[in-house]
Every structure is written in C-alpha cells, then in structure tokens.
C-alpha cells in the first residue's frame, strides 16, 4: 500500500499553481455581473510571531467558498496583502532594535511562506503592502480629497495619550478595565492631553452610515454595535440663560416632557464656561475637581455602576418656561464631546440624575407618574405616565402630549429647537509615531495649512536612525529639521503620521488595480468588481476598520470615484479558535509547559498539585499557542484546513485540540488508499450512485451556506460507504474528487491526475450536479434471489415500481454472473421485499 506522502504532494501542487498562475484573474467583460465574485479576507498585519492556528480559519473559509464558486463557473477575485504600517510593526522594531522597514519586510516574508504552505488560491500578482510608496501615495491622495472636501481639519483638543506607545489614540482604541482606561493594543495606561490634532469629520456622514446599514448582509450584532456607536438621538436643544452672564447653556434632551422636573443643570468638566461662571469662593474646589475628572475615560465617567461625582459652581440658570432659578453643577457623568456638553438634571426621571441628586441632597421633583398622583420614589421613574406638578396647561396630560406641547412652546418662544444628536465623534487622525504615512500638508509662518500638490505625491517617509517616540507628544519626524523645514518655500511640514487604519480604509480598492501609477484604481475595474461580495474577518473590527472604511468609501462615492454606496455587501465574523490552558485552585492560569498529565489528570510540575484544564485565548505567556507550521509538518495542510472547518460552525468560538486532527488525517488517508482498489469504468451499483448524489447535494447546499463542518461530515460518511465496495468506480470517484477539492485541494489535484485527467482540476472540471430522483430516501431492503436462493441484498426507494425493480435486479453484478448461459423462465417480484429470478 503506497503511503500518503502529503508533504511531497502539497509541495508539488503549490509549485504547480505558482508556476502556472492558476489563480490569476483578469477582467473579462463578456462575463455577466452575476457571475463575478469578489471574496476578501481582512488582511493581516505582519507581526514577528507569525501565524498561529487561529489566523487561517477565515482564510480557509474564503478559500473553500472561492474554489467552490470557481468550479461553478464564477469569475472569482480572491486577493491578499499586508497591513504593514502602524504600531505593531513599529513596537517590534523598537523592542529588537531593527529598523521597521527591515523587520516589516522580514515578517511579511515569514507570513507569505506560512500562508502559501496552506495552499490558498490567492492571486499573488495583486499583493499589496500598505507601507510601500506605490501604495501610500494613494492613501495620501485620498487624504487630500478629504481635506479639499472640508472633511479634514486641525484642532487643539483633549485626546488620549499613551506614554508607553508614545502616541495619541482614537476613542475607539481605548478599552475600559478594572484598572482604568487602557490602550486597546498592549493594554497600556493612558492619560488625557491637549494636543494639536488632525481630525476627520466622520460625523458629517453619521446619518448615512446609520441608514445604509439596512442594505447590508451583516451579522445583526455588528450592525447593532455600529448603531450604538453612532448613537442617534432625536430630541430638543434648550437654551438656559445664566444669572449675571450673557452666555447661555445649551442642553440636548430626548425627554422634553420632563422639563418641569429640572432641579439642577450639570456641565462637563471640559466645558469652557466653567472658569467664566464659577463664583470666586467656589473656584478652587471646582478647578481642582475639573483637573481630576479630565483624566478619566468616557466609559468610566458615564457608567451606571460608577459613583457619580460633582461640584457646585455657585451660579444659577433660569428655567426657560417657569423662570425659576436652577443651580449649575460640574459633573463627571457629562461628556464635553457628546451633545452640548451639558445636561438638565431631572432626578425623578433619570437614573444617573437620581443617583447624583441623592448623593448631593438635591431636590427630586416628580412630574410624571403612573397614576397621575404624587408617589414616593425609591428609584427614577422612566416609564410613560400622566404629568403632575407642572404648570396648568401642561398638567394632567399623557407625557407624550406634554412632549409635543413643550416642543411647540420652546420653538415659538425661541428658547429651543428640535435637533438630532449623535454619540459618534470626529475621528482623531494624527499619530505621533514614525512608522506611518506622512500627512501631505505644509504650514506657512501664520500656521495656515497648505495641501501638497497631487503631483508631489508620494510624500516619502524619510529614513531615520532614531525612530523611537519622543515621549513629549511630538512625532519622531519633528527631529529631522532638514525634512521639516521646506527652505525654498519658508514652510514647515506636518510631522504627525496617519494611523494604521488609514491604509486599511481602502485596500480592497487597490487590489482591483495594484500596479496603476496614475490613479488609485481604474474606474472600469472598480465597476467590474465592486462591491465586495463576501468579507470574512474578526468581530473586533466592528467600530474601527469597518466604520472607517465605510466612511472613506462614501466620500469616494460622493466624489464619483466608486460606483457603490457601500464597500462590503456581506460580512461574516469567524469565531475565535481558543486553546487549552491550566488553572490552579486560586484561579491563576499557568503556562502549558509547567503541566504534566498523569492518568487523564493534570498536575503542576512545581508543586505536584492537580490543576483544571480550561479554555483560554492563545497567548505566548501561557505557552498555548499552536504553530500551523508544526501541524502542517505532521499532518499536512489539507488535514489542517479540513480540521479547522470541521471543529464547528464557522461563526462559533471553539478550542483547538491537536488530538482531533488525527481523525481528519485518517479520513484523508482512507481517500488516498482508494487508489489501491481497481479503478473500474463499469456502471456502479445503484446504492452507491444514490450515496454519491446524496453527498453532492449535501456538500453543495452546505458549502453555499458556509456550513463547512456538516459538508465535511457528509463526505466522511460517504467515504465509509465507498470503502465497502471491492472496486473504486470511476463514475463515483471522479465527481467525489471535485467536491472534495475546495476542502483538500492538494490531495484532490493528485487524485485528479491519478484518474488520468489534465491538471489543474480547478481549470478543467465543473462542479457536479445532483439528481434528486437518484437519491434513495425511504429505503427498503430488497432481496435478490435466483431460484429462491439469496444472491444479494440492496437498498431501494420504497416507491420503486415493478418494472424498475426487474431492471435493477438484472443489472446487479452478482445476479449477472449467475445468469451466464442460463435461460430465464420468469421473474417474480414482491414489492418492497424481493425479486426472484427463476432459471433452468
């Protein structure tokens, strides 16, 4: 029996695909739009660690689907590239002392080798790298279009600064932990700083970003997260006059029906009015409080679980309708960047206001109740009800009626107006780091921004020896005086660079025309392929990459450069592949190499105490990272591909277990060993024809729906059926090889060649069609006899008729061999039971 030499087979076919450019694709206008398919993976950033087994999960899914569609006559575009600018590459360079240009190239080569070893059907001629000049020239060009459209501006603003990373981070890059706000990458401490920043007006597109979600085939959870991040609210903006001041406080509220329950106003610690309106004898306390609160994260300040804090300014405002005096407080739970930076305190009908009022013993005045009568409140009443404690014309009404009347009164008396507000804030676009796209802007002596001419692009990132962050909030580029100062013009360059998200905002468009030096992509090519039909990647990018790229795409659409309103038609988030780790009694996880297994139990080598096996995220510190190179070396790429898809539904998280891949490896060996049987061109038995059409149907339907685990299961069942036969029937084996090929392309190509077909299977075959009528559904065992003696037993559909039963019996190989030179006297058929052939 010849051994399944997967290493040799996989190397052979990977070289064949490379040398023959099997997966290279060009635009062909004769192919109708409905037969074109653009499949995309979220491209990787090339870290020094390389891939672990979790990374290829999404790539394998798109590869299977792409190959399946290719065999179904689709014109498939499936490109790959590298998100090679940004913090991960730069941090690695700083840690190792290797220049990011060099380390990035080395890491990309490592990634490419690992990706190619898995046999993915990428068109490598379309490879892109966001750090290369021919790519970031167009990132800079798009930035200039944003600037010219008034969507990029400079602003001195409070920003999150990470001393460890040496850069400003966007709100979306901050996570809340029990130890306070941290950077999303690295979980480093952050602080608030006032710095000059480039900001993009994503808020101008808030409504469209919200509305167009309805057109997308995306997971509802992702759409809901984007809706919440954009945070649309419809309400009223109300003006409050301040006692002794000409300034006014504007408040946005979605509950104008509670206006008569206002007992205080709260303004954000960032509000510029604070110094102006605070009474002298309150100033010291107020300014101390402001300084303390500005360093907290937005999430920390607004969380319902967090203790509400505040300080009285000593000043008062006037109620816009009743003219009553209302105390003005500064409070941590109000954000200067959301709405107007001020809220009306209605403690009877808002939980945060209720907590605040209780803490500082402020008046709580209910103006809505369920019964229309005063009731004792143990918590804020936030439901609908009847108005109470209000001026006569607003009293004893449904609160919905009060809302309408208040809006009309405020509008008529010019004390307020209807308004839509969003939680979404403009995108902080500057980074004080070296390894990123230089921003193509000059400043004159007065500080006016002057965009570079388009024919001066790319503005190249200068090579420097010291690329470490300055620690002062300035970019490392600011140290290169001869680059910063444009002497012949008397201008200075912008020294901040773009964030990592810039290059990934539009990469899917560059794949369409990666070598074009005259434009970011030819318009006809964009119209040919866009939008992306299937996009697979991690859910962690919901409010970062996915929101940013939608924004840039809409700008390009408005400018007439792209033909679709949205870039990604269908999105799938693959589940996380976790790993096993080990936990001590106190809950502490210990590294895997510190654990020993005895009698199916696990023990800590250090103290010999039993530990519990748990599921945890793969991490270097826990030593539970599985390297795909090791798996491929031991079991092969096809085994790894199939195992990753067989572990469970694509969108579910699941733990990696190397023991589980052994079963998949056996499955592929079973298929390989079919070569040992005679390859017969005879007509196969009806039962195996039925099994073939059943498996084609199942694999077709499940692959179409991305239900890869159940498709693989069906193929495993089929192979066990096929192994029962003495011969390997060509008419069965050939279509099976084709349906196997998206899942195990290397083995399929080898078997395709073995049965005498021309390679590549992916260019010289078509996906087989199933015939429903050939599938035996309600099975009955039929006994085949000659002169009353049993010769065979077969399974047939219950509804098989007498004529067909006779024909099937006469075609049976065991019956045929016993009929040679014999005369048939008669054929007796008992439906759903037997066929008896009487001979002499």
UniProtKB/Swiss-Prot annotation:
> What InterPro entries is this protein classified in?
aa-tRNA-synth_I_CS, aa-tRNA-synth_Ia, Leu-tRNA-ligase, Leu_tRNA-synth_edit, M/V/L/I-tRNA-synth_anticd-bd, Methionyl/Leucyl_tRNA_Synth, Rossmann-like_a/b/a_fold, tRNAsynth_Ia_anticodon-bd
Localization per Swiss-Prot or TrEMBL? Cytoplasm
Swiss-Prot/TrEMBL catalytic activity: tRNA(Leu) + L-leucine + ATP = L-leucyl-tRNA(Leu) + AMP + diphosphate
Record's SUPFAM superfamilies?
Answer: Anticodon-binding domain of a subclass of class I aminoacyl-tRNA synthetases, Nucleotidylyl transferase, ValRS/IleRS/LeuRS editing domain
Pfam hit, one = tRNA-synt_1
GO molecular function (one): ATP binding
EC number in record: 6.1.1.4
Q: Which Gene3D superfamilies match?
A: HUPs, Isoleucyl-tRNA Synthetase, Domain 1
Q: Does the keyword Aminoacyl-tRNA synthetase apply?
A: yes
Q: Where is this motif: 'HIGH' region?
A: 44-55
What highest taxon heads this organism's lineage?
Answer: Bacteria
- Gene Ontology biological process: leucyl-tRNA aminoacylation
Where would you say this protein principally sits, based on its record?
cytoplasm
Q: Top enzyme class of this protein?
A: ligase
Q: What are the entry keywords?
A: Aminoacyl-tRNA synthetase, ATP-binding, Cytoplasm, Ligase, Nucleotide-binding, Protein biosynthesis
Q: Does the keyword Transmembrane apply?
A: no
- Residues that, per the record, bind ATP: 620
A cellular component term from Gene Ontology for this protein is: cytosol
Signal sequence extent: none
Motif 'KMSKS' region is found at 617-621
* Protein family membership: Belongs to the class-I aminoacyl-tRNA synthetase family.
According to UniProt, the name of this protein is Leucine--tRNA ligase
What is the originating organism of this protein? Borreliella burgdorferi (strain ZS7)
């Amino acid at each position: 029996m010849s051994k399944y030499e997967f290493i040799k087979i996989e190397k052979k076919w990977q070289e064949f695909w490379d040398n023959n450019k099997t997966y290279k694709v060009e635009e062909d206008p004769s192919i109708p739009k409905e037969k074109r398919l653009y499949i995309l993976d979220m491209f990787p950033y090339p870290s020094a660690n390389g891939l672990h087994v979790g990374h290829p999960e999404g790539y394998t899914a798109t590869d299977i689907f792409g190959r399946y569609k290719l065999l179904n006559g689709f014109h498939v575009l499936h490109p790959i590239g590298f998100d090679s600018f940004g913090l991960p590459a730069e941090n690695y360079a700083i840690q190792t002392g290797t220049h990011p240009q060099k380390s990035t190239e080395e890491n990309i080569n490592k990634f490419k080798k690992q990706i190619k070893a898995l046999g993915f059907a990428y068109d490598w001629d379309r490879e892109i790298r966001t750090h290369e000049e021919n790519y970031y020239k167009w990132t800079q060009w798009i930035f200039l279009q944003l600037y010219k459209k008034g969507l990029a501006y400079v602003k001195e603003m409070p920003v999150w600064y990470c001393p460890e990373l040496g850069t400003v981070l966007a709100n979306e890059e901050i996570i809340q932990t029990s130890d306070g706000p941290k950077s999303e990458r690295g979980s480093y401490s952050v602080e608030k700083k006032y710095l000059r920043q480039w900001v993009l007006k994503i808020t101008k597109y808030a409504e469209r970003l919200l509305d167009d979600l309805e057109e997308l085939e995306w997971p509802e959870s992702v759409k809901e997260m984007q809706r919440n991040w954009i945070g649309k609210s419809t309400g009223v903006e109300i003006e409050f006059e301040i006692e002794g001041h000409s300034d006014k406080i504007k408040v946005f509220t979605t509950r104008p029906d509670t206006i008569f329950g206002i007992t205080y106003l709260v303004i954000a610690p960032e509000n510029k009015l604070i110094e102006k309106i605070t009474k002298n004898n309150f100033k010291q306390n107020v300014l101390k409080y402001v300084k303390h609160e500005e360093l907290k994260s937005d999430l920390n300040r607004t969380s319902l679980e967090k203790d509400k804090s505040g300080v009285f300014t000593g000043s008062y405002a006037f109620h816009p309708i009743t003219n009553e005096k209302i105390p003005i407080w500064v409070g941590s739970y109000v954000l200067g960047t959301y709405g107007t930076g001020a809220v009306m305190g209605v403690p009877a009908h808002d939980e945060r206001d209720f907590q605040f009022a209780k803490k500082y013993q402020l008046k709580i005045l209910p103006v809505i109740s369920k019964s229309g009568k005063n009731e004792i409140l143990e918590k804020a009443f936030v439901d609908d009800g009847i108005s109470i404690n209000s001026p006569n014309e607003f009293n004893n009404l449904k609160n919905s009626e009060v809302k309408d009347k208040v809006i009309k009164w405020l509008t008529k008396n010019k004390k307020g107006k209807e308004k839509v507000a969003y939680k979404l804030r403009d995108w902080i676009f500057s980074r004080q780091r070296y390894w990123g796209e230089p921003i193509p802007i000059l400043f004159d002596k007065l500080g006016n921004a002057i965009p570079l001419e388009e024919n001066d692009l790319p503005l190249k990132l200068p090579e420097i020896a010291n690329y470490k962050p300055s620690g002062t909030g300035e970019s490392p580029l600011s140290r290169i005086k001869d680059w910063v100062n444009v002497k012949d013009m008397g201008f200075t360059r912008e020294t901040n660079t773009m964030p990592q998200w810039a290059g990934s905002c539009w990469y899917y468009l560059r794949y369409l025309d990666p070598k074009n030096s005259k434009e970011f992509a030819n318009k006809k090519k964009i119209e040919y392929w866009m939008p992306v039909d299937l996009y697979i990647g991690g859910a962690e990018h919901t409010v970062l990459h996915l929101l940013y790229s939608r924004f840039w795409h809409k700008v390009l659409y408005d400018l007439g450069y792209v033909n679709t309103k949205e870039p990604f038609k269908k999105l799938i988030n693959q589940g996380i592949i976790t790993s096993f780790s080990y936990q001590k009694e106190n809950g502490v996880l210990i590294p895997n190499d510190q654990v020993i297994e005895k009698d199916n139990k696990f023990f800590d080598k250090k103290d010999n105490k039993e530990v519990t096996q748990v599921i945890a995220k793969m991490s270097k510190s826990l030593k539970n990272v599985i390297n795909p190179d090791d798996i491929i070396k031991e079991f092969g790429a096809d085994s790894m591909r199939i195992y990753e898809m067989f572990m469970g539904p694509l969108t579910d998280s699941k733990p990696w277990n190397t023991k589980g891949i052994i079963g998949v490896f056996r499955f592929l060996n079973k298929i390989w060993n079919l070569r040992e049987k005679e390859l017969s061109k005879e007509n196969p038995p009806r039962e195996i024809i039925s099994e073939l059409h059943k498996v084609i149907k199942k694999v077709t339907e499940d692959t179409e729906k991305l239900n890869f685990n159940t498709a693989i299961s069906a193929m495993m069942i089929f192979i066990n059926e096929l192994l029962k036969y003495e011969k390997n029937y060509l008419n069965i084996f050939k279509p099976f090889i084709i349906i196997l090929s998206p899942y195990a392309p290397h083995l399929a190509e080898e078997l395709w060649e073995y049965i005498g077909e021309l390679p590549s299977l992916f260019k010289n075959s078509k996906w087989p069609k199933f015939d429903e009528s050939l599938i035996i559904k309600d099975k009955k065992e039929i006994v085949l006899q000659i002169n009353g003696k049993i010769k065979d037993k077969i399974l047939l559909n219950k509804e098989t008729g007498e004529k067909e039963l006779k024909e099937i019996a006469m075609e049976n190989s065991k019956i045929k061999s016993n009929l040679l030179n014999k005369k048939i006297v008669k054929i007796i058929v008992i439906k759903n039971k037997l066929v008896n052939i009487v001979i002499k």
